[in-house]
Design a protein with these regions (language model features):
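Conserved glycine-rich cofactor-binding loop
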Residues: 7, 14-15
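Active-site helix of classical SDR
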Residues: 121, 157
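The beta1-alpha1 cofactor-binding region of Rossmann-like NAD(H)/NADP(H)-dependent oxidoreductases
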Residues: 39, 60-71, 103
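Residue(s) in the substrate-gating loop at a strand-loop-helix junction
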Residues: 141
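Substrate-binding pocket helix/loop in short-chain dehydrogenase/reductase
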Residues: 97-98, 105-107
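Conserved glycine-rich Rossmann-like NAD(P)H-binding loop of the short-chain dehydrogenase/reductase
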Residues: 30-45
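C-terminal helical subdomain
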Residues: 181, 201-238
Length: 263
């Protein structure tokens, strides 16, 4: 698809992956709507987007307020002249051993990472179906397919989102609306590693990839129609290996985790 003259709504757009994706979409010719809580940072991203797409707009909104999402979606459609591309990027981490996890923390992660994007998607979907076109992008994680240690709540939320997207891809066949999931690994340039209530990552942070690689993956799935794209791509081989022998995969992750945590 061409993005020239189309509109795109990006959540979690005030920094990190969301900001870079929004700017990439604007540079490709789309009018971009930005959604995040931090108005000051959104204004900075909006200014950069407007260098390419002057009609871009922003909404300072808290997506954990599920009851406000329908009004946000309606306002975005009015302002942007319909939403052709939705990138559900807003989310939160939760890096904690399951024996240290509280029920409230698990629910909070599922609330923002799964229920919120589902609400926004369902609010915008009727307009896409009516127009006979649209692209729904979920920002997943390799954790959705691999279930890494110390990330049970986060992995479950991204797995739920991925499963919803898989079913939706079949349900929307023939409507003109396409469905995509981008599954990033460790990405630099975010603030997620420093948020309170999270353990230090077990993985080596020097392996983190720039968010521009995620933005490139979003543009690629929009252009190709591909359902799922890993960043980096070789994680698809790891996911396939896990599917072939889950017991062996879990045994290997246990050994890797023991080695990483050894004094």
């Amino acid at each position: 698809m061409t993005l020239e003259g189309r509109s795109a709504l990006v959540t979690g757009a005030s920094s990190g992956i969301g900001a870079v994706v929004a700017e990439a979409l604007a540079a490709a010719g789309a009018r971009v709507g930005l959604v995040a809580r931090r108005k000051d940072r959104l204004e900075q991203v909006l200014a950069r987007c407007r260098e390419h797409a002057p009609d871009s707009a922003m909404w300072a909104a808290d997506l954990t307020d599920l009851d406000a999402i329908a009004d946000l979606a309606a306002d975005a459609e009015r302002t942007l002249g319909g939403v052709d591309v939705l990138v559900n990027n807003a989310g939160m981490p939760k890096r904690r051993r399951v024996q240290d996890l509280t029920p409230a923390e698990a629910e909070e992660v599922m609330h923002l990472n799964h229920l919120s994007p589902v609400r926004l998607t369902l609010a915008l979907l009727p307009g896409m179906i009516r127009r006979g076109r649209g692209n729904l992008v979920a920002m997943g994680s390799v954790a959705a397919r691999l279930g890494p240690p110390h990330e049970a709540a986060y992995a479950a939320s991204k797995a739920a989102l991925t499963a919803f997207w898989e079913s939706m891809a079949v349900d929307l066949d023939g409507t003109g609306v396409r469905v995509h999931v981008v599954q990033p690994a460790l990405i630099a340039g975010t603030e997620l590693f420093t948020l309170p209530g999270n353990e230090e990552p077990i993985s080596d942070l020097s392996d983190a990839l720039p968010p521009q690689e995620v933005a490139a993956a979003v543009l690629e799935v929009l252009a190709s129609g591909r359902f799922e794209q890993y960043v980096p791509g070789w994680f698809s081989e790891m996911a396939s290996g896990k599917a072939a022998d889950v017991d062996a995969f879990i045994a290997g992750v246990k050994e890797w985790t023991r080695d990483r945590l050894a004094p």
